[in-house]
């Protein structure tokens, strides 16, 4: 299981800019809204396996979705011992292979806005998302740069309909 925080940017104009927010994360959320036929974007939102969405504060729904996700078969994603390559195993689907770089832990002091004078603790906050290429169902290997100190990386295999086919992280 790989948990990542894609911080959206549409609240940035309300007195404080989230240092992890990005337009690409906002676009990703809007793509999920379209694919999952939600109709609108909102926060806090959790997407599980690219196929289920729920309000992030609904603990019972989140735990049920995570339990169901663990039972599903995934395409193997494994990192080499030297941390410089990742292999996507064989499977019956096709998808995009994505590389995510994220901050393991960060503390942010909020100066203004709704959370003024609060200190926020973030874990696995996405810093960048890039494409490694396409996966057509056959085993495939990609060269990668290992994570820097305080950083993690995740490799996701995602179908065109948004479903996660495989994932792994390296810290």
Listing of model-derived features with the role each one plays in the protein:
Residues 1-6:
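Conserved helix-turn-beta segment immediately C-terminal to the redox Cys motif
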Residues 8, 50:
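Residues that line or immediately flank small-molecule/substrate-binding pockets and catalytic motifs
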Residues 46:
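Ligand-binding face of N-terminal immunoglobulin V-set domains in extracellular IgSF glycoproteins
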Residues 17-42, 51-171:
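Short, conserved sequence motifs used for protein processing/export or organelle targeting and
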Residues 11-16:
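A short acidic, helix-capping loop that chelates divalent metal ions and anchors anionic groups
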């Amino acid at each position: 299981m790989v948990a990542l925080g894609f911080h959206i940017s549409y609240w940035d104009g309300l007195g404080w800019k989230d240092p992890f927010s990005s337009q690409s994360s906002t676009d990703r959320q809007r793509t999920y809204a379209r694919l999952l036929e939600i109709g609108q974007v909102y926060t806090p939102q959790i997407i599980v396996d690219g196929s289920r969405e729920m309000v992030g504060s609904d603990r019972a729904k989140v735990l049920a979705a995570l339990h169901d996700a663990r039972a599903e078969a995934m395409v193997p994603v494994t990192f080499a011992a030297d941390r410089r390559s990742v292999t996507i195993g064989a499977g019956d689907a096709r998808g995009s292979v994505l590389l995510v770089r994220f901050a393991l832990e960060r503390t942010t002091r909020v100066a203004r806005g709704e959370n003024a004078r609060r200190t926020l603790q973030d874990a696995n906050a996405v810093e960048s998302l890039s494409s490694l290429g396409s996966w057509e169902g056959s085993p495939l290997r990609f060269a990668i740069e290992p994570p820097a100190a305080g950083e993690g990386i995740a490799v996701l295999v995602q179908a065109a309909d948004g479903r996660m086919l495989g994932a792994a992280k390296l810290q």
